[in-house]
Every structure is written in C-alpha cells, then in structure tokens.
C-alpha cells in the first residue's frame, strides 16, 4: 500500500519547526594566549577588555586585565601559571574584579577572591562589590571624633586612635607589630566593631597561629581573615588588601564600624613590583613602578568616618548599585596598615610613602623590645595626628603630661649614666620615670579596659606609685585593679559611662590607692 505525501502537510510541519527554531547564539569576546609565565599572561584579541576586568582562562584559572596595550592585553593570573599554555583561548567575563560581602563572611578564612579556605563549607552571600572603588569625597566624610580603643596603655594614652583613622604600625621584623594589631582586634569584643585581618605574604603557619589566637579569645565571631600567603601567586598578594577594604566598606556604608589590618603592605608593594616588572612597566626608585605611591594612597584613602546625614551619605560617589538601598550614615572604616622596616630605616621608600599617607604612626623598636619593654613603642617618634580629638576626656586629663614626662626621663637617664652625684629632684624624676615606663608595659593578648588604664596612669602621673618598689609595679597594678573591680566598682563604672574623671572619683581612687599601698608594702617586707 503506497502512502501519498501531501505537500500542504509537509509545508505546515516545516513552518512549525522553523517557528520554533531559536536563532540566538552566545557571543563571547575571546582571545589567545601569546605568552605565559610567572603569574603573567599576554593575550591577543581582547580589544574591548577593561582595566581590572576578570578574564577566564582554561582549567578554571581566573585572571585580571592590568595592561591594555595596542596589540595585546597583559593579564595577571590568580591561579597556577602551569595550568595555562600558549595558544589557549581566553574569555572576557565583562565583570570587574569583585568579592562577595556580607555578615556570612564573619568567622571565616577566605582568599582574596572571596573563596573560603577554612574547610567550613561554602559562604552564602547576596552581594558582590568591586575590589577597586574611589574613596568617599570630602562632603560625605565627618572628622574623626569617636575613640577606637586598642586596649594597650601606651597607645590609648599617648597615641590615641579614632574610628575612621589610618594609623601605621611600623618597625623591624620581630618587634611585635602583628601582636599590637591582634590585641586591638581582641579588644573590640562587644564594642560593635567588625574586624578584617588581611595577611599578605605571611607563612601559612603564621596565619594559622593568628586564627587560633583569635578563636581562643572569641574574636573570630566578629572577624574575617583574608589571606594570600607567601606561597600564593603575586597577583593574589597584590589584590588582598583591596579585598579587605571592600569588605570593610560594606560595613562602613551600612552604618556600622569596621577595622581592617593590612599585615603587611611592604609585601604587597614587593608583589606589585614583581607584576609591574613582568608586565614591562618602567621601573623607578628601588625598581618599584612609578605608581606605587598611588597603590597605597588609593587603598588607605578608603578608610573614612562617614557623615551622620543619611541623605548626604546616599549620594556618595562611586556607590555600587547593590548597596544603594542599604546605605546608612555614621559608619566608619579604620585602617591599621603594617610596614616592615630594614634595620630601623624609616626613611626608605615605602615606609616614607605610607607615613605621608597615614594619620600617624606607631614606631616599634628592636632595642626596646630586647630590653623587655613590650609593646616596644618609641614614644618619641610615634604620633597620632587626628586621634587626640577622639580620646576620652578622662584619659586626656591623666595622660596629658605623660609623653613629656617620659621624654624628660629618657634624657635624664642618658645623662645619669655619666655621673653618680644626682640631686634630689633629678633622682625623684628618674624614679617617677622608671615607674611610668613600668606601668606602660603590658603582656600579649591582655588588652585592658580604658577605665582601668585611666586609674593606673592616674596613680603614676600623680606620683602615688613613688612609694612602690619599681620591680613590684606590675604586681601592684594587677592587685590594685582587682581591688577596684571588687570593692569600688562604681569608680570604674563612672569613668566608663561618663568618659570623664570627676574630682570625687579621682579622690576615691587616691584614697583606695593610699590604703592599698601601705598594706602592699607591708606584705612585701613580711
């Protein structure tokens, strides 16, 4: 039986199929790898790539366009260079380098691309923000006026830090720079400050130690650790601080307070120098590229105290669309960059650059560290340019003459080594100075509440400790603060709540100290 083909049926079937045919095609802008090695790839064909745009290489290796030249694009690789070879196809993503942000990041250890590396599973966040962003303009800022307590007596009394400030921690290796930063993070517990610790070029074991310390003191609850270790590619070390700043800006722009520690920026500068030389950019002083100052200035300028006026804050320059509905005023981002010097040379290229960008510096010295003064802060050349207006009144009152007293003590101490015949006044000044130096010493990971600092510094500057043997000052401090806490809690409470040291509060501290010193000295003789 022969079947007859009806032309109208055939044409209707063809019409149906043609109507359902989707002619859409995915269009990718692709290029070819010309050369690869040392974390750098030269790509031909990506004529529309933007500076800072993410590029997709084979084997899930991501890269970023950094050099836009006439005939090729110089890209840095965020993965292993040996996974990419000449002739490989590279895709443009159309996305500028960004990082996921949100509360889910707290308590986690991530790499600079926002990927978790702590084995605690994926991080669920809704928002991505660009790594590079212009700093808020002058109109959107407010002057620094709220204190950020570090818990370290030497810093909170003489080199105070305010929320929104950039304070440099500078010193040779092994002088306690990281310890100062970690103590500050631990001291933010219960103060509503979110912390970001950015480890750049450190050993993996050192980062693990920092994370363990933060966990031990319950600080990981409000902290994110971003790490690009010494074994990670240079491009990751280069972008790590920008990832920290972006995460901090999320908290700052949503009306909260954040603290970011960059440990350390000398290693970021070295990584950037490596990339720049491999990209054939012309070298300048110490072989650093000409824009190494801009590298650090554009990063540190992002730390700011934002205006309380929400309407003004919402008009902030370069505000990402993802944040516009969440903006609140009054937030702050405080930066503590760390710089490592060689043999105490603060006048080298990178240290002078960062000193000129920041609002002050805390200078740590090997000699002081080795002589047992810890934190090993050289008060003479350490300074906080804007923190004074953020210091609480009580501390300003008791520590007003502290810096001068210590400077005079150091001078007299140097002279007293030459001669043994000292008059009474000089001897008294030397004794007072030795006790002040002693009360500023502090153990690691034992930050002290500001009201306790005020009480003990008050005794030192008022000369009440002159009767206590200098070798027993630390013991006295511990026992006296314990006494205040249990027998006179209202004294500490008054300082903490009002931020001032009223005359009757000062008298109560004096009375308690005089009684306690008598019994303390008797105990010592017994």
Swiss-Prot record:
GO terms for molecular function: ADP binding; ATP binding; proton-transporting ATP synthase activity, rotational mechanism. SUPFAM superfamilies: C-terminal domain of alpha and beta subunits of F1 ATP synthase, N-terminal domain of alpha and beta subunits of F1 ATP synthase, P-loop containing nucleoside triphosphate hydrolases. It catalyses: ATP + H2O + 4 H(+)(in) = ADP + phosphate + 5 H(+)(out). Pfam families: ATP-synt_ab, ATP-synt_ab_C, ATP-synt_ab_N. Produces ATP from ADP in the presence of a proton gradient across the membrane. The alpha chain is a regulatory subunit. This is ATP synthase subunit alpha. GO terms for cellular component: plasma membrane; proton-transporting ATP synthase complex. Keywords: ATP synthesis, ATP-binding, Cell inner membrane, Cell membrane, CF(1), Hydrogen ion transport, Ion transport, Membrane, Nucleotide-binding, Translocase, Transport. Belongs to the ATPase alpha/beta chains family. It is found in: Cell inner membrane. The gene is atpA. ATP binds at residues 171-178. CDD domains: ATP-synt_F1_alpha_C, ATP-synt_F1_alpha_N, F1-ATPase_alpha_CD. It is an enzyme of class 7 (translocase). It comes from Chlorobium phaeobacteroides (strain DSM 266 / SMG 266 / 2430). PROSITE patterns: ATPASE_ALPHA_BETA (PS00152). Its EC number is 7.1.2.2.
